[in-house]
Every structure is written in C-alpha cells, then in structure tokens.
Amino acid sequence: FDKSGHYKWQNFDQFLTIYEIVTNIFLDEKNFEALVRHVLDKQVKENVIYTEIFLGPHLWSDRPNERWERFLNIASKVADEYEKKYGMYTYFIIVCIRHLGPEKALEASRFASKFKDKNVVGFGMAGDETKFNTLDFMRSFDFAKQSGLGTTTHAGEICGAKSVDEAIKLGVTRVGHGVRSCESEETIINLSKENILLEVCPGSNIALGLYP
C-alpha cells in the first residue's frame, strides 16, 4: 500500500497480480453480492439509468461449474432488484482472461452464450494484452457473435495501435481503452469505417502510468 492506503504497483504485471489477489476476497458469495450492491449503489447515486458490468468467471473458479452459475445468479438477482426499485437497467458482459489462453476463453464464451436470460448481453476479453496472438481467440468471439452477443476486447492501452488493428480483425463491436489508436492514422480510419466504439477509461490510463 502507499501512504494514502491505496494499492501500489510499479508496472502492469504487478497490477494484474494485485488485482487477482484482491478478487479472492469476493470468492465468498456474501462478499460478492455485497460488491455488486456497492457498485450499483454508486450508480444510483450518480443517477445512472443503464449499466454494463464485466464479470470474469475464471476469477470465481478455474473451470466451468455450478459455482459460475451461482455467482451469475447472484448478480442477476441484484440487477433485477435494482431495476424494480430504482428503474436502473443492469446487464453483464462475460469476459475471458487473455493470459489464461484461448481454451479458457472458449469456456467463458460458451458460458456467456448459455445464460443470455441472466442479463448477459456481451462477451469480451480483458487481462494482459501482451499474451498470445489476438487472432488465437477468434473461435471464442465467433461463437459469441453467432449466439447474438455483443463483443469487446481490451487493446491499445498497454500495447500500441497494432493491437487495436488486431482487435478490429476479431470483428468486435467495441474496443476497451483503444487510446493508443491515436498513434496510427490508419487505425483511426479503420475504427471509423467499422463503426467500432472505444470504451475509454482515463482513470485506468493514468493509474497504470500511460498518461501523467
């Protein structure tokens, strides 16, 4: 921790390590439900009426099992409660963890496609942008798209514009971050041509030292 009590890291690898350690706190179902409620309470205070939340099931268990379904049911139950109480719509994007590899990604994609009735609207990829070739995950994204899910992947934050070019080839409808697209005029043009939205998060970019 730093002097103000915040988590402290020196690089992206350390950030990912700390992130995964912290997620262990939420392997308890009561803690996980409390986390979902905390997030949605903050949204209500900000007068947000539509929210999409990333859920990474491989952080709950290293393989698909009934635990995945239980945790999704918890999140979906809370989302329905807040919709009835506050009129706020909450949906989920199931994400694979890139550095766990393509086979794990396919597990997450199949899970997302199976539970579209549980407020799941999309499939995405987070994690270490430097691991594996982006196109190694094509099968997972194709499966999700064929199931009618929206798709997104992190690119263009830790890695440069080339990583965004690879994300475009996946056929995603959004790119998480994507800020380093500005390093290539061609990348910007291609994003525009394909009508791909950038999910920009300045807080992450600053926290990870990408920008001062």
Predicted region positions:
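Metal-cofactor-binding active-site regions of metalloenzymes
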Residues: 1-149, 159-163, 169, 174, ...
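Glycine-rich beta-to-alpha transition loops that act as phosphate-gripper elements at the mouths
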Residues: 154-158
